[in-house]
Each structure stands twice: as structure tokens, then as C-alpha cells.
Amino acid sequence: MVPDLAELKDSQWSAEFETLMRNRLIMGAFRYGMIKVQKKRAKEGGKRYDVVRAVAEKVRLYEETGNTEHIVDAANYCLLVFELDPHPNKHFSAHDDAGGHCQIVK
């Protein structure tokens, strides 16, 4: 039986993870400015951060240490890539299940 939408919404997210993400994003606003200000600054040719590289580095650090702080940071950097990255071919194109997902390792 397929769960109803409310159950899926409740089970397919982590409130703790979201809280950790939001808390760190709020602290980041003090350090680096609010996301909408960073977006404006980037469009005007101002200072930008290499957030794509930061995602990979945070995942590497998590794999090395097991510290989930790095995964929270990687998730926030992914959000910043979505919002701020100036990739010239940036777009969203949904794909089906054909080969683009995690593989079973155990």
C-alpha cells in the first residue's frame, strides 16, 4: 500500500537536519551577507565564493571524519549553488530513474 501524501511529507524529511541547516545559514548571513544580497552582488560582478568546490570538500571531510556538520555544510553549499552559481548553462532538467541514483553497496 502506498502511504498518503501527509505521511510521505512527514517521513521523507529530517526536521533536525533542516534546523541545523537553517541555523548555519543564519550565522552565514552575519559572516557573508544574506543570500539575496550575495545574489545581487554576484550579478553586479562583485565578490563570489567557489561553492561548487566547497561542496566536494565538505563531502570529502565527512567521509574522512564522520562529522555530520560537514554534510549540513555541504547541503547549504548546494543551496547556494542553486541560488548563486553563475554557470553559463545552469538549468533544471528532471530525469527518470535510468542510472542517475545511488547504488546499493551492502
For each feature predicted by the language model, list its residue ranges.
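Flexible "arm" and connector segments at domain edges
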Residues: 1-106
